[in-house]
């Protein structure tokens, strides 16, 4: 299975996250954010902090990189709430 994976440390809270985008189907991609330990191992693979499904590769990659960049500088709870509403 192909995908993108990034390790992110939030500057405001020092929390660590793993952002993952994988291909779930022919035209279905899923981006998930997992809370991570100090060594960037996901704390729970079955319960991601946020999950976003998209229908094109370009849209999935844009979502992945936008989440990665914003998660570095913004408060995670606000960011997750914003993305959950859209």
Task: Cite the ranges covered by each PLM segment.
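Short N-terminal "domain-start" leader segments
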Residues: 1-33, 38
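Membrane-helix boundary/juxtamembrane interface motif
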Residues: 24, 32-34, 61, 65, ...
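Intrinsic disorder/low-complexity signal
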Residues: 25-29, 57-59, 73, 81
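A short, exposed loop/beta-hairpin motif centered on an aromatic-Gly-Thr core
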Residues: 39-66
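Short arginine-rich
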Residues: 65-80
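Intrinsically disordered, low-complexity charged/polar segments
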Residues: 80-86
